Amino acid sequence: METKQFKAESKRLLDLMINSIYTHKEIFLRELISNSSDAIDKIYYKTLTDDSLKFERDDYYIRVVSDKENRILKIADTGIGMTKEELENNLGVIAKSGSLQFKKENEVKEGYDIIGQFGVGFYSAFLVSDDVTVISKAFGSNEAYKWNSKGAEGYTIEPCEKEAYGTEIILKIKDNTEEENYDEFLEEYTLKSIIKKYSDFIRYPIKMDLTKTKPKEDNKEEFEEYKEEETINSMVPIWRKNKNELKSEDYENFYAEKHYGFDKPIKYIHTSVDGVVSYNAILFIPETTPYDFYTKEYEKGLELYSSGVLIMNKCGDLLPDYFGFVKGIVDSEDLSLNISREILQHDRQLKLIAKNIKTKIKNELESLLKKERDKYEKFYESFGRQLKYGVYSDFGSNKDILQDLLMFYSSKEKKMVTLAEYVSRMPEDQKYIYYAVGESNERIEKLPQIEGVLDKGYEVLYFTDDIDEFAIKMLMNYKEKEFKSVSSGDLGIEGEEKENTSNSDDKENKELFESMKDILSGKVKDVRASKRLKNHPVCLANEGELSIEMEKVLNAMPNNQNIKADKVLEINMNHDVFKSLKEAYEGDKEKLKLYTDLLYNQALLIEGLAINDPVEFTNNICKIMK
């Protein structure tokens, strides 16, 4: 029996196949099953073009058999089989695809896409085997042939006996090494898991004889093992079924089967697109946040299938980061894959699918907000933070997509409201969208800075997430209305008369404020009369783009650079405390320093900032109480 050499620089190419193209050894089973599916597809195609042939679906299947004792794994199919010449051409020439040639020579009917295109999948068998045998009998032929290879040195082909047409691949599984455990590819559980993972939606049954137990007939307390044939794969994926025939329970069951979460999805999206690129997709918006969602360990992405075969567990390129919470699958026959089918080539089709999915998710969320407000608010409680990160990231380039999905607590409505709802209620004389920042709604309601805005009857949005103000800085405005913090220097609510009064107060008490500023040198940029305070004696305002709350967030980060906002100490001229300040300035400079330090530290505490010297602060309080 003559040993023939592989063509196409066999040794180097086969070594490349085994060591470089595939990153996961378990992929071999996916590739061999896909080849078997292609072989059955070819039989089906012949029945479409030859009226004398009938396609009885029950006659066509793929069988996987494990023989642990002899370290043999078999993958058999009832497909079209191969002649001697086809064995020579398809298996003797690495990177020649019989399926691709079949597709070129025949117009494959819609609904039956032949998977193979590179002619390399078969050689993934050498990832787990160093002795590969193929026994095949071509449809319509009386002759069968056996192809065998032990690696890059070559292969043999000889006649053999085989009753039915089809192909059987026999792998002699490698022995274990220190680095690799090959025994697992003989275990029923592992084989079943790999089939479910990669080939669950192959359209033909993938059968295995599984070991089970039952009570012995003569002794019910003892159990015996027996074999039972099972079809491992689901075959018809839910995304290819008619949406009108599916119920909510079907989607919820699929969500649970895929282990997307322990909750029920708050919304599912089933879409089928035909056009420049065709695909089916089922997307789920979870109800609750995964435990690791806001950690670097979380990996976004959708399951990606090509013609029902899993290509990627999580294709991150299909989802923008701000929609990274979405779970689901995409299946398309139009994708450009690399030679191993493990890595997707970044092409126009993928980008188009991703763009469509992004738009679909946005539209569904807007619909949920409009029609099922309670559900949306529950979703927003879990994932609103991610949407705000989306506005902040990439220098605000996504703000137009996300701004109408944002919600904040309202001082007026005492509930979450959208920016559109806020703007729709603004009085004609209101120039800005006002917001206040704090650790909680309760803390914000007690802020001195909020008094003046509420006194005007204006609505204030409460920002309690550390990302809120950063996101708004990127948003800048909404429907031509700028955002304004209640702690900012100029609130834009003072009338001309009040403005003049305030300026007059600053001039009249210029020397007092200068003295206080000197006492607080390096701590505040200025001391001035307040235009916003009603009942509180003092507060801190900020000048510039960096707010006091942003300072707190940035300085809480690792490797912070002790960033400081420009602070202004504002004094309520109508409060009794101011009278004490004036008296101290006129008669007791030491007492003025004491009062100034106390008021500054009081303002720091109101803002949730640490005071520099707590001991001195408490001693100063004691001095006043003497």
Swiss-Prot record:
Region (A): 1-341
Role description: Molecular chaperone. Has ATPase activity.
InterPro entries the UniProt entry points to: HATPase_C_sf, Heat_shock_protein_90_CS, HSP90_C, Hsp90_fam, Hsp90_N, Ribosomal_Su5_D2-typ_SF
Stated name of the protein: Chaperone protein HtpG
GO cellular component: cytoplasm
Annotated segments matching region B: 342-552
UniProt keyword Oxidoreductase present: no
Alphabetical list of NCBIfam families matching this protein: PRK05218.1
Feature: compositional bias, Basic and acidic residues: 498-509
Location of this chain's protein in the cell: Cytoplasm
Location of region: Disordered: 490-509
Region (C): 553-626
One Gene Ontology term of the molecular function aspect: unfolded protein binding
Family (UniProt): Belongs to the heat shock protein 90 family.
Alphabetical UniProt keywords: ATP-binding, Chaperone, Cytoplasm, Nucleotide-binding, Stress response
Binding partners and assembly: Homodimer.
